[in-house]
Amino acid sequence: MSSGHFFQWHLCDVFKSAMCCVSCTHTLSLLLCVLTLTSAATGAGPETLCGAELVDTLQFVCGERGFYFSKPTGYGPSSRRSHNRGIVDECCFQSCELRRLEMYCAPVKSGKAARSVRAQRHTDMPRTPKVSTAVQSVDRGTERRTAQHPDKTKPKKEVHQKNSSRGNTGGRNYRM
């Protein structure tokens, strides 16, 4: 083996070890950076959702179903929580997970009720018989009386639908 070949092989080995050192140094610095960012993120503490941010997140999670501010009956063991707690108590004063937010979504409507009127063909709609104007005025009076005196014996649940007046979120990310 000539000295030229020996020098060429030796130089190649030097470059390989130099590349290995650079690669190891680069990997080590990248690892330190990731560890620093991870510990800073976990040290920031739990994230809470309050006010408009809570409402926006609930609208995002629940979608068209809507949501309740107080938990509907039948969710979770009642012995663990007091009965007057709601989503604000659970997510504004302490951090809450996605599962907790989903508990406040309104139930999914049945397939027939959720079907859009626009999706129906116009021939699917039954024709209503014409009614005389005298009967219509009596019906409207009954409707007014019913609206003025709602049945107070039935419990009412207030479902909050998506509020389109809040504006477009513009692709805003939601924190959980």
Curated annotation (Swiss-Prot):
Region (D) location: 107-114
Region Disordered, residue ranges: 115-176
Secreted listed as a keyword: yes
GO MF, any single term: insulin-like growth factor receptor binding
Propeptide positions: 115-176
UniProt keyword Disulfide bond, yes or no: yes
Function: The insulin-like growth factors, isolated from plasma, are structurally and functionally related to insulin but have a much higher growth-promoting activity. Acts as a ligand for IGF1R. Binds to the alpha subunit of IGF1R, leading to the activation of the intrinsic tyrosine kinase activity which autophosphorylates tyrosine residues in the beta subunit thus initiatiating a cascade of down-stream signaling events leading to activation of the PI3K-AKT/PKB and the Ras-MAPK pathways. Binds to integrins.
Name of the protein this chain belongs to: Insulin-like growth factor 1
Organism listed in the record: Oncorhynchus mykiss
Lineage, highest ranks first: Eukaryota, Metazoa, Chordata, Craniata, Vertebrata
